[in-house]
Amino acid sequence: ALWKNMLKGIGKLAGQAALGAVKTLVGAES
């Protein structure tokens, strides 16, 4: 279904954003 694909896309974007935030935090600390 369409909404399933949308959820997949949103999940991917959220995951990438979370990874980016973690990398930024780790980079700022070191």
From Swiss-Prot:
InterPro entries: Dermaseptin_dom. Keywords: Amphibian defense peptide, Antibiotic, Antimicrobial, Secreted. It is found in: Secreted. Expressed by the skin glands. GO terms for cellular component: extracellular region. Transmembrane segments: none annotated. Its main location: secreted. The keyword Endoplasmic reticulum does not apply. GO terms for biological process: defense response to bacterium. Belongs to the frog skin active peptide (FSAP) family. Dermaseptin subfamily. Antibacterial activity against Gram-positive bacteria S.aureus and E.faecalis, and Gram-negative bacteria P.aeruginosa and E.coli. This is Dermaseptin-DI4. The lineage of its organism: Eukaryota, Metazoa, Chordata, Craniata, Vertebrata.
